[in-house]
Amino acid sequence: MSLILIRSVVRKLVFFTAAMIIFPVFTFFVVQYLSDNALVSGGIAALAANVVLIGYVVAAFTEDTAALEKKEQ
């Protein structure tokens, strides 16, 4: 397996891991600040986590591994 491919995968994984931790928590507290309803804050934070997850799935499926392997050679 290519070192370029491994770096790309690890970089993408680290980005989405950080986004999965930071984005929902940030969203929860921002919505909590704007509205006193904890249920709404939790629901929107869950929605934010799903947005990050869908983004990761889309990024993983659109990753062009054939071009990266060809670029290596």
Curated annotation (Swiss-Prot):
Motif (Prevents secretion from ER) on chain: 70-73
Protein's name in the database: Vacuolar ATPase assembly integral membrane protein VMA21
Keyword annotations from UniProtKB, A to Z: Cytoplasmic vesicle, Endoplasmic reticulum, Membrane, Transmembrane, Transmembrane helix
A matching Pfam family: VMA21
Domain of life of the organism encoding this protein: Eukaryota
Compartments reported by the entry: Endoplasmic reticulum membrane; Endoplasmic reticulum-Golgi intermediate compartment membrane; Cytoplasmic vesicle, COPII-coated vesicle membrane
Location (main, coarse): endoplasmic reticulum
Regions of this protein lying in the Lumenal compartment: 34-37
Family the entry assigns: Belongs to the VMA21 family.
Natural source organism: Meyerozyma guilliermondii (strain ATCC 6260 / CBS 566 / DSM 6381 / JCM 1539 / NBRC 10279 / NRRL Y-324) (Yeast)
General function of this protein: Required for the assembly of the V0 complex of the vacuolar ATPase (V-ATPase) in the endoplasmic reticulum.
Membrane topology category: Multi-pass membrane protein
One Gene Ontology CC term in the entry: endoplasmic reticulum-Golgi intermediate compartment membrane
UniProt topological domain (Cytoplasmic) ranges: 1-12, 59-73
